[in-house]
Amino acid sequence: MYRIAIEKLLKWKQSKRRKHLIIEGARQVGKTWLMKEFGKQAYTETIYINFDSNSRMAELFASDLDTDRLIMGLELYAGHKIDPDNSLLIFDEVQEVPRALASLKYFYENTPQYHIVCAGSLLGIALHQGTSFPVGKVDFLKLYPLSFKEFLIATDKERFAELLDKQDFGMITCFKQTYIDSLKQYYFIGGMPEAVQSFAENKDFNEVREIQKHILAAYEQDFSKHAPNEIVPRLRRVWNSIPSQLAKENKKFIYGLVRDGARAKDYETAIMWLSDCGLVHKISRVNAAGIPLRANEDLKAFKLFVVDVGLLGCMAGLRQRTLLDGNALFVEFKGALTEQYVCQQLKTIEDLEVYYYTNDRGSCEVDFVVDTGEQIVPVEVKAEVNLRAKSLKTYQEKFSPEVSIRTSMSDYKKEEWLVNLPLYAIDQLKVVTDA
């Protein structure tokens, strides 16, 4: 299975300013596989340590963090001397041993020649809870579920993925039905590696759904196992409310949908926990369009999306036939899935900050507004071929962005102020807007 993140890891290896690396991401997005695959491709040997199951290595880090002593212990574990240039050290589930995380500071300061990559299913929570590790002494990489482009490659449509990267929209339009059919499959399957691998091998949607159910069950088990006891019920309520939150026309998160009488102060910690472990994307509102967008962020108003579009469909009990064949009643939630999909793809674009816009009266809403670092780009999402963009036009007249994006099932089309970018090509947003 091809992951674009491999290319980032190869660049990391060659960087003269390389620091030891922490990979963040939700459970089961493929962090362990990625690290091991990187080791196979780029190193003579890989030394893999899982701190959740290897008590001996946990004990190694329990006393002092002298790096010479630690390297000796790692060499004894490996059974030979470690070659810094040709060996990859993998610390998996590193949040289970906070001192192993803290040791990265000393490895960086005293033995930077070694190549160390770390990951953990709940590492985001450990980092935000104050586990000691040196900010500025490590590099970070965020891993998400497979993007739509990676899904195309995994399902033997690599040439179609290459065509997207070339932005040959004339050729893309000729084969748009292939893209649309694959996009519908992606809405159901999503990008969780196990689900994609299963579909690529067996083409069995029922098997995919069972895998998704198991992943969701594992997430719920994490709530009980790792979250503070007092917030576990609130975690479940927030998590289970997301499909109904997104099914609304106005997808702003409403606490009253979680529980009658619910207030922000009762659920803020639960939402932060879900966000820290990578299970949700919290997209905040902005009410202006200045650079940087973060300066206009309204922290009290936000949308919550889950980590994966396939998991959202599973949570909502969406049937394969409804999604792939269509249904007259399948209208509102199609919009939810489409917006979830777009959010998920935008999150995979490097150096892109994602928000949404409403004016203070609430009479104008733009589904997403992104900060590319160079410009602010409004993005209107349409589930089908609907080309009406009233709110986008209002935003354009008020803020005059260089370009506005409407993404839909319609073909690519560039107008004076507006670009219609097909949903299956939304990952090309930065390239298209910079052109």
Which functions belong to the PLM regions below?
Residues 34, 38:
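Hydrophobic positions on the alpha1 helix immediately C-terminal to the Walker A/P-loop
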Residues 200-365, 369-370:
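Accessory nucleic acid-recognition modules appended to NTPase machines
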Residues 23:
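Hydrophobic anchor at the beta1->P-loop junction of P-loop NTPases
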Residues 128-247:
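Interdomain motor-coupling "hinge/lid" segment immediately C-terminal to the ATP-binding subdomain
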Residues 346, 366-385:
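Conserved catalytic cores of phosphodiester-cleaving nucleases, focusing on short active-site segments
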Residues 1-14:
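N-terminal pre-Walker A segment at the start of P-loop NTPase domains
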